[in-house]
């Protein structure tokens, strides 16, 4: 099973070691007793469900525009028999303040913005703590990873309607996360699977737990010490599956490569430095061509 880390443990060094070990061996773990109120998580899920229950025309008032990362959109995916499946998504930048564009934030339900902003504050604190532990696990100062990867936060909701042919359709195809760190809440419908030891493992649903994925940027910063977990999502035949990822990344103009302190003649860099925007462009182009 995917490691579960209890953040209420009074021994912070033990917690940090557990997070580091999970990031080295799995590239994914779940955290419980993380300090984000259960009631807030329930409200976050409630307003997310209510938004996706709105008529399509009303959701389109938040539609993503050409060239924008943010906003509401619908992806039509084909299963292996060329039948259409639907994935609805909304992306909202929450940090830094200069990146926030309320043009894309839902006006309904009325408390959507308040709840999402409160959750964004909590999850930023949690992600910074995790990045501090990961930096220390590399023998570096606490700020090392955060200074590069903790610069841009985007909140996302994935909404996967029921699909009768779910055995032949992935909500998201196998991939590693393009960003550095992803913190995910899901509803009770299973579907997230991670690849380890040559087989797919279903991530156990734990109410109010947060799933943490190591992505490409932290893998590169660590010169490969931390794994970028390969994962996919499945859909349910009868019930709607939803997830609430927060994507933590560098800003587009930042250049990312192995941290210099981690490389030497005996341990040369495994990755070439590259601007994050170029990395994103290259990977998206590759995935499009692959599909």
Swiss-Prot record:
Pfam families membership: 2OG-FeII_Oxy, DIOX_N
Recorded superkingdom: Eukaryota
Main location: cytoplasm
UniProt key word Transmembrane: no
Keyword Metal-binding among record annotations: yes
Subcellular compartments: Cytoplasm
Binding residues annotated for Fe cation, in chain numbering: 175, 177, 231
Pathway where it operates: Secondary metabolite biosynthesis; flavonoid biosynthesis
GO cellular component: cytoplasm
Keywords in alphabetical order: Cytoplasm, Dioxygenase, Flavonoid biosynthesis, Iron, Metal-binding, Oxidoreductase, Vitamin C
Cofactor-binding details, from the entry: Binds 1 ascorbate molecule per subunit. Binds 1 Fe cation per subunit.
Enzyme class, UniProt record, top EC level: oxidoreductase
EC number(s) recorded for this UniProt protein: 1.14.11.9, 1.14.20.6
Chain coiled-coil ranges: none
PROSITE patterns: FE2OG_OXY (PS51471)
Cofactors required: L-ascorbate; Fe cation
Molecular function as annotated in GO: flavanone 3-dioxygenase activity; flavonol synthase activity; L-ascorbic acid binding; metal ion binding
TM regions (residue ranges): none
Reactions this protein catalyses: a (2R,3R)-dihydroflavonol + 2-oxoglutarate + O2 = a flavonol + succinate + CO2 + H2O; a (2S)-flavan-4-one + 2-oxoglutarate + O2 = a (2R,3R)-dihydroflavonol + succinate + CO2
InterPro entries in the cross-refs: DIOX_N, IPNS-like_FE2OG_OXY, IPNS-like_sf, Iron_ascorbate_oxido_reductase, Oxoglu/Fe-dep_dioxygenase_dom
Residues of the Fe2OG dioxygenase domain: 151-250
Stated family: Belongs to the iron/ascorbate-dependent oxidoreductase family.
Protein function: Catalyzes the formation of flavonols from dihydroflavonols. It can act on dihydrokaempferol to produce kaempferol, on dihydroquercetin to produce quercitin and on dihydromyricetin to produce myricetin.
Record protein name field: Flavonol synthase/flavanone 3-hydroxylase
Species, as recorded: Matthiola incana (Common stock)
